[in-house]
């Protein structure tokens, strides 16, 4: 389990989460340092009791990743945590990214998949979250997508992306396809932050998966609209290309700090889906079956 290259297909998977992340220096806000072990450990135990078996952890290089924290969570809760490798988005790149050759960036990712992360036994199971800016893919971001493609071709591990406010998903897919990536091995993140159905249908038609992974962040986009968009996807028979998550990133998101907590997805959002006419099989498809296929 400690290598986390595979997931437990018997339970649910939260496809885009953070257990330890620190963007506080970028955002000048201590709330953006998610590191409270006891609270997070408690929430993972709650999720485990609700049938969740896997957390796909999206904190990559220079985002405050902590591999020992993840290993401890697995040991203390039984939850499987799949770690990632890569770089996030232009505004968060360290200075050396600009001058580092694409091939070297790719090799860093390959090493974290095949050897381990920062000297630990934890190996990355996914290349993520590879990001783009709002309405643009910068040249350095394009270089990072190229590096991710090389790492994918070398290791076979899937790619999970970050779109800023649900923009540039189609452009990300075009870039990855040009670099030889089979799009069925790509999931486009944060597709649920605006009215986005036309693009979602086009991305699924290209073979990619899409994530509704900011569930509960009603200040960005209301969950009722997420349910409505998922309803349209269901009516077209395309839920087999959808995965769900919450993208917890702040201390204030944790239940112990007054936030919704990780279990909001199951205790609040899933009931909204069922009330809207979704079946339990639909829920299982998005939370269990699709991740079991994609993250294999």
Question: What is each residue range found by the language model?
Answer:
Residues 10-15, 20, 29-80, 103-122:
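Alpha-helical scaffold segments that flank or form the walls of functional sites
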Residues 72-75, 80-155, 209, 214-219:
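Active-site gating/metal-coordination segments in enzymes
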Residues 23-27, 67, 93, 169-174, ...:
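Histidine/acidic-residue-rich catalytic or RNA/ligand-binding cores of hydrolases
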């Amino acid at each position: 389990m400690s290598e986390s290259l595979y997931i437990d297909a018997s339970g649910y998977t939260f496809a885009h989460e953070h257990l330890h992340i620190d963007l506080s220096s970028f955002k000048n806000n201590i709330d953006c340092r998610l590191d409270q072990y006891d609270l997070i450990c408690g929430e993972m135990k709650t999720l485990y009791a609700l049938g969740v078996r896997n957390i796909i952890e999206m904190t990559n290089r220079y985002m405050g990743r902590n591999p020992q924290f993840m290993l401890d969570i697995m040991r203390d809760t039984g939850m499987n945590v799949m770690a990632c490798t890569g770089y996030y988005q232009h505004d968060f790149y360290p200075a050396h990214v600009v001058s580092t050759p694409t091939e070297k960036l790719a090799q860093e990712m390959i090493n974290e998949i095949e050897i381990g992360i920062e000297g630990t036994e934890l190996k990355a199971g996914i290349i993520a979250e590879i990001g783009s800016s709002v309405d643009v893919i910068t040249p350095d971001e394009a270089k990072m997508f190229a590096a991710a493609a090389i790492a994918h071709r070398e290791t076979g591990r899937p790619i999970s992306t970050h779109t800023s406010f649900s923009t540039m998903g189609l452009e990300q897919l075009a870039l990855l396809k040009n670099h030889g990536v089979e799009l069925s091995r790509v999931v486009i993140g944060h597709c649920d932050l605006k009215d986005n159905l036309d693009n979602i249908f086009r991305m699924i038609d290209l073979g990619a998966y899409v994530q509704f992974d900011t569930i509960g962040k009603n200040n960005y986009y209301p969950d009722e609209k997420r349910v409505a968009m998922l309803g349209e996807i269901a009516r077209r028979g395309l839920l087999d290309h959808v995965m769900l998550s919450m993208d917890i990133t702040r201390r204030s998101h944790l239940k112990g700090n007054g936030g919704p907590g990780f279990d909001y997805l199951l205790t609040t959002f899933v009931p909204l889906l069922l009330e809207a006419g979704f079946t339990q099989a639909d829920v299982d498809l998005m939370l269990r079956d699709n991740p079991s296929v994609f993250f294999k």
